[in-house]
Amino acid sequence: MTTTTPYRSVFAPGLLRGQVIMVTGGGSGIGRCTAHELASLGAHVVLVGRNPDKLTATAQEITVDGGQATWHSCDIRREDDVKAMVAQVVQQHGRIHGLVNNAGGQYISPLAKTSAKGWQAVIDTNLTGGFLVARECFNQSMQQHGGAVVNIVADMWGSMPGMGHSGAARAGMVSFTETAALEWATQGVRVNAVAPGYIASSGMDHYPPEAGPMLREMRNTVPQGRFGTEAETSAAIVFLLSPAASFVSGTVLRVDGARPQMRMGWQQAVATPDVQERDAVKPFDGFHRAVTPKVFQ
């Protein structure tokens, strides 16, 4: 039964009808929001992650809203598990039209105090795992049918103090994106990336309470004077999966309010609240099930 979903997407209804799109890390944060928008546009969303409870909850939300979603528990750092998971998805659905490589994670640690184990864990999750999922989606489906891959990276331009492990992994994923776009173009596969800046997402809840004041102050380093929303990030992802981006490949779409362009000595003031409400920059939040991070509550 098809019902009208309450997600307020800016894209045309039915845009992705009939497509199977995999979203890793789809049980929370940006992945959860993106899964909802994709489903609202007609896609069958395949949620992938390590937490069955979160995946089940998101799949149930999508179903209640009239969409279609299934889920697979998988540790994307384990090569054999990824191969088996993708094979199962292809067997169930015939092909994979799109992949949102969203799974990731990091923790606050200066380089001098980062252990080799901690460094490797972040690299495995944010770089190696994404590579494995993309490779298997290509080898087992997209190589034969074409497709679109969107890798989620981060605002690591210039540096990423306190999270050097994540910055290195994300920079590696940008290079992977560019190389895969070249190597896989002959098979009709597009590969792009989205780099979220400071987004008010549930991912912020993973940081310790003492980081709260610092997180809240980060808005003052963004020229637009605010945090982005999950829905603003999701919209960028959907665009890159859509036919409108058919000639876009090998690029990184930043969703960051121009934060990397801030320069010492150049008018460090940010947009005031009244300016933030102007049509071209006012916050967009089409996600009807968005959850405010605890640090902002």
Model-derived segments and spans:
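Short, small/polar-rich loop/turn modules that mediate ligand/substrate recognition or access, typified
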Residues: 100, 185, 190, 248-250
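Conserved glycine-rich cofactor-binding loop
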Residues: 27-29
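C-terminal substrate-recognition "lid" of short-chain dehydrogenase/reductases
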Residues: 131, 226-255, 260-261
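Catalytic loop of short-chain dehydrogenase/reductase
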Residues: 150-172, 177-186
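Substrate-binding pocket helix/loop in short-chain dehydrogenase/reductase
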Residues: 110-111, 118-123, 218
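Short C-terminal tail/terminal secondary-structure segment
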Residues: 2-13, 238, 249-297
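Alpha-helical segment proximal to the catalytic Tyr-Lys
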Residues: 139, 182-186, 246
